Amino acid sequence: MQQDQRKKSSTEADFFTEYGDASRYKIQEVIGKGSYGVVCSAIDVHTGEKVAIKKIHDIFEHISDAARILREIKLLRLLRHPDIVEIKHIMLPPSRRDFKDIYVVFELMESDLHQVIKANDDLTKEHYQFFLYQLLRALKYIHTANVYHRDLKPKNILANSNCKLKICDFGLARVAFNDTPTTIFWTDYVATRWYRAPELCGSFFSKYTPAIDIWSIGCIFAEVLTGKPLFPGKNVVHQLDLMTDLLGTPSMDTISRVRNDKARRYLSSMRKKEPILFSQKFPSADPLALDLLQKLLAFDPKDRPTAEEALAHPYFKGLAKVEREPSCQPITKMEFEFERRRVTKEDIRELIFREILEYHPQLLKDYINGTERTTFLYPSAVDQFRKQFAHLEENGGNGPVIPMDRKHTSLPRSTIVHSTPIPAKEQPRIGPSRDKPSDEPYSNPREFDRFSGNAPRTSQAPQRVPTARPGRVVGPVLPYENGATKDSYDARRLAMNSGYPPQQQIPQAYGYYQIPGKSACSELSQAERYTLHQQAYTCANSATVTDVALDMRAPPFHLSGGPKSDSSERLAAETNLYTRSLNGLAATAAGVAASAHRKVGVVPYGMSRMY
């Protein structure tokens, strides 16, 4: 039991690699494999729903494969319909620039129509009718969006035990625009031959229509009725022979409209064949079903009905109402601009990343506003909160909150000790007057420079650490600006010590400096004490220091508001504070001197409040 559990955990780790949403899904079993990757069944621990997760690996190895994946996820986002498989989620990759795999979360379907046909020999006429109804209803929605599926076959139609069907696999689909060159539109057509319309087998026409999908639906419906493929051709010529064996040779009018000279000559030279009665080919089928099937399998595409016209056929009386079957708005050219120009792998990667963000609304908003991050390997605490809020937004405010994972980049900031002295830097004279608290809180942390009368300067801070690379642990060092820190990802600001309420005594730092010949600080003479006092006062008020300075005027916390006063009042108040705390400052100077003697600089971090 434990061995199975460990094996399952190992499988999950191998399946998800570094993707952060992995904890949301509990892998059950592998339900499919192919050249694209692997499909696993899983449970969404947030909703309890069963899903199928399709891992597509190395998607950018071949640009044609990447374009096919982009096309499919884009179309499935745009074509939302009960009879079309739904993408529920796409996991956010660990890096925007370097990801190679994607994880697409679908609703879980138990089987496909190919398996249903093979395993069930007891399907009823009601099954046949309901199956065809769902397929035509989905096709109506697809075609009203000006989309041709181009690869309809039983394996691309998912099925559940409750007879629910859903069309999937839009990798070969295309959006038809009036100005799309036909030669480009069909150059990569490699759909399964058995379900391919005759005009595609022989390149009969230069302009193709949605009738190619109608033909495929007819072939699928005939296979449902008989349990075996209708036209299992071994090659294109054999395929055309099988078609004409059932339907008869096409009329001279149809042949005359064939644009391809070779195909036209072949059809003209074909011996005359009479069509076979469908009632003879399908003896146990409903006559209305056969009447509709014969229309779906018309050799000439202009004789085939549209999906909407087929739904209005008497075969669906009492089941379908054309006016209530949904239609889709035509898809705009902008969505598929990449199909009309030469694109690189980097272009496709960016477009796929943009599609992934459609399932992460908050990050999509940042992306559109130009404030997105380029890597998501090590999220900070703020990123974790954003993830929780995005989860609640995506789930309509329902469902449990994602637990906060403790990441090394969100650990508390520790004291940074430099092994070499920090170069002398100019110390800012910041901090508002401490005579009385202000009744008006200010929102801009830069305003205290105006209150104090000082020009903006850069406060002393630890030297900036290079940006962390994936896999390298580097503590967080925020950029400093005028005593405030700013998160590069968030518009909110962190203000350091922008205000300080009146108090009796300022924080003190204690140290001991031993003068040669003296055992301790307590043995200093009055003159030596006075000298140290003067040094401390000079250090506290000077603009520069020679080695290391601890600005004890900066408290370890601050309030959101600060008093407003002129510089003379502020100076008087600070002078009084320094006079009362002269002994403490002397000890501070002694500590500074000791630190300088040891050549070790200690940079204290005060707590700050986010707003």
Swiss-Prot record:
Chain positions recorded as ATP binding sites: I31, G32, K33, G34, S35, Y36, G37, V38, V39, K54
Biological-process GO terms, alphabetical: intracellular signal transduction
GO cellular component: cytoplasm; nucleus
Biased composition (Basic and acidic residues): 426-439
Entry PTM: Dually phosphorylated on Thr-187 and Tyr-189, which activates the enzyme.
Modified residues (Phosphothreonine): T187
Catalytic activity: L-seryl-[protein] + ATP = O-phospho-L-seryl-[protein] + ADP + H(+); L-threonyl-[protein] + ATP = O-phospho-L-threonyl-[protein] + ADP + H(+)
Active-site residue numbers: D151 (proton acceptor)
Residue span, Protein kinase domain: 25-316
GO MF, any single term: protein serine/threonine kinase activity
Keyword Transferase: yes
Region of interest (Disordered), ranges: 394-481
Matches recorded under SMART domains: S_TKc
Domain remarks: The TXY motif contains the threonine and tyrosine residues whose phosphorylation activates the MAP kinases.
Protein name: Mitogen-activated protein kinase 10
The species this protein was found in: Oryza sativa subsp. japonica (Rice)
